[in-house]
Amino acid sequence: MTIKVGVLGAKGRVGQAIVEGVNAAEDLELVASIDRGTPLEKLVESGAEVAVDFTQPASVMDNLEFCIAHGIHAVVGTTGFDSERLAKVEGWTQKEDAGNVLIAPNFAISAVLTMVFAAQAAKFFDSAEVVEYHHPNKLDAPSGTAVHTAQGIANARQEAGLDAMPDKTEQSLDGARGADVDGVHVHAVRMQGMVAHEEVIFGTQGQSLTIRQDSYDRSSFTPGVLLGVREIASHPGLTVGLEKYLGL
């Protein structure tokens, strides 16, 4: 059975890769390409069952409210979701005949595994820091992936009953130690030539562990997005993180 898909942000760099992936899949049909100036009603008129959103933080909430209210499932790679926004989306999904929502900080399978592996490793090391690298046109810093990774590390450390990480450093310049995400330092690099990359560095007495993930092309997000499109109907309400669709 073919799943009818609409792509929001279809002319963006990631959106173009998603459109190409949907068109190449025998079990998916692209029925709507939505960009600035295109009314969201096109999703309803085309019979879209799932909408993929790679737009902007400023517009994603309106997009989600529309999709959920019209019973259209939404696979979302747009960033900018804090706890308040997530709570609002979850509330929308609880209404009768609402669409389901998958929000993932990263759809690259390698990035998802990096987050999972980092959380597993966290309890074995005294120190952990996250470094993310992106192209200079990325709008936010640190990335949602880096924040999600740091939160996973912090949660794992808390569950293991670990003390705060050792750090007696006094900053001579503000920001020298990066951002603090629940006690985990996160550093954002913006550099020409980069796409999306992350390093998680762990240290303890006499040893260290580095977990690194690299997305060299935006097509790296396509397999994860298509997995979400295929599976979202069987995951009611709001799901945050692709790892839950992977059984991790």
From Swiss-Prot:
Enzyme class: oxidoreductase
Active site: 134, 138
Pfam families: DapB_C, DapB_N
Keywords on record: Amino-acid biosynthesis, Cytoplasm, Diaminopimelate biosynthesis, Lysine biosynthesis, NAD, NADP, Oxidoreductase
Residues where NAD(+) binds: 9-14, 77-79, 104-107
Subcellular location: Cytoplasm
Reactions that this protein is recorded to catalyse: (S)-2,3,4,5-tetrahydrodipicolinate + NAD(+) + H2O = (2S,4S)-4-hydroxy-2,3,4,5-tetrahydrodipicolinate + NADH + H(+); (S)-2,3,4,5-tetrahydrodipicolinate + NADP(+) + H2O = (2S,4S)-4-hydroxy-2,3,4,5-tetrahydrodipicolinate + NADPH + H(+)
Entry annotated with the keyword Membrane: no
Protein's UniProt name: 4-hydroxy-tetrahydrodipicolinate reductase
Superkingdom, natural source: Bacteria
Any one Gene Ontology BP term: diaminopimelate biosynthetic process
Binding site for (S)-2,3,4,5-tetrahydrodipicolinate: 135, 144-145
Coarse class of the protein's main subcellular location: cytoplasm
Pathway: Amino-acid biosynthesis; L-lysine biosynthesis via DAP pathway; (S)-tetrahydrodipicolinate from L-aspartate: step 4/4
GO CC annotations, alphabetized: cytosol
SUPFAM superfamilies the UniProt entry points to: Glyceraldehyde-3-phosphate dehydrogenase-like, C-terminal domain, NAD(P)-binding Rossmann-fold domains
Gene Ontology MF terms in the entry: 4-hydroxy-tetrahydrodipicolinate reductase; NAD binding; NADP binding; oxidoreductase activity, acting on CH or CH2 groups, NAD or NADP as acceptor
Family statement: Belongs to the DapB family.
Keyword NADP: yes
EC number: 1.17.1.8
Record InterPro entries: DapB_C (IPR022663), DapB_N (IPR000846), DapB_N_CS (IPR022664), DHDPR_bac (IPR023940), NAD(P)-bd_dom_sf (IPR036291)
Protein purpose: Catalyzes the conversion of 4-hydroxy-tetrahydrodipicolinate (HTPA) to tetrahydrodipicolinate.
